Amino acid sequence: MAIADWPAHERPREKLLTQGPAALSDAELLAIFLRVGMPGKSAVDLARELLAHFGSLGRLCHASRREFSAIHGMGPAKYAQLHALLEVARRALKEEIAYGQTLESPQSVKDFLRLTLGHRPQEVFACLFLDVRHRLIAWEELFQGTLTEARVYPREIAKRALHHNASALILSHNHPTGHVEPSESDLVLTRELCRALALLDVRVLDHMIVGRAEVYSFLEHGKM
């Protein structure tokens, strides 16, 4: 049955307008994005199939163009729409960080990092460079590595901090395995970077490890 034939209160779009987006399932939200289904399948049916194929909404959103387009009916136009939506979300979170003091909105920082790094297949080390009031100056992905490791060069981080005239920064890297507990090497690296940057009068405010579903903050766990 087409969604247009459903009772009004069950249709995803009407449900969102009357009850808010939190009331919708992943499949219902995705159906609004898809707009239409296929012969014999409603948009909700198609959304459920996509979620089952990729395993989760996060994996679907971060599928490669080749993986996404391999699904019948999901061509380059839908892929472009999806990634435009993701980029809008990233930029909105980045603006929220930029216009407020970063430490006053740690959840915004976590959301931005999770959306940006959480589903990357290789380890990426990145920095948020901040001014004296802890507002965002720049975001840079500095090093990329393998599934388990990205080689980090403290001198390069120091050079970028000086380039941006940063007074502080937040370190971040993802764990593609999804486990966010810091390793011993993560702890050692953080201490080394704190010492090296302190010589330049640049303060490391936090180091965040990003997984698919959560973000670990060194500051919140008393490790800074």
Curated annotation (Swiss-Prot):
Specify the domain of life of the species encoding this protein: Bacteria
* Motif JAMM motif per record, residues: 173-186
Q: Where does Zn(2+) bind?
A: H173, H175, D186
Q: Which GO terms of type biological process are on file?
A: proteolysis
In the UniProt record, does the keyword Hydrolase occur? Answer: yes
Q: Give yes or no: UniProt keyword Protease.
A: yes
Query: Which family does this protein fall into?
Result: Belongs to the UPF0758 family.
- Domain MPN: residue ranges: 102-224
Q: Which Gene3D superfamilies match?
A: 5' to 3' exonuclease, C-terminal subdomain, Cytidine Deaminase, domain 2
Q: Which InterPro entries match?
A: MPN (IPR037518), RadC_JAB (IPR025657), RuvA_2-like (IPR010994), UPF0758 (IPR001405), UPF0758_N (IPR046778)
UniProt keywords, alphabetically = Hydrolase, Metal-binding, Metalloprotease, Protease, Zinc
- What are this entry's molecular-function GO terms? metal ion binding; metallopeptidase activity
Q: What is this protein called?
A: UPF0758 protein RSc2444
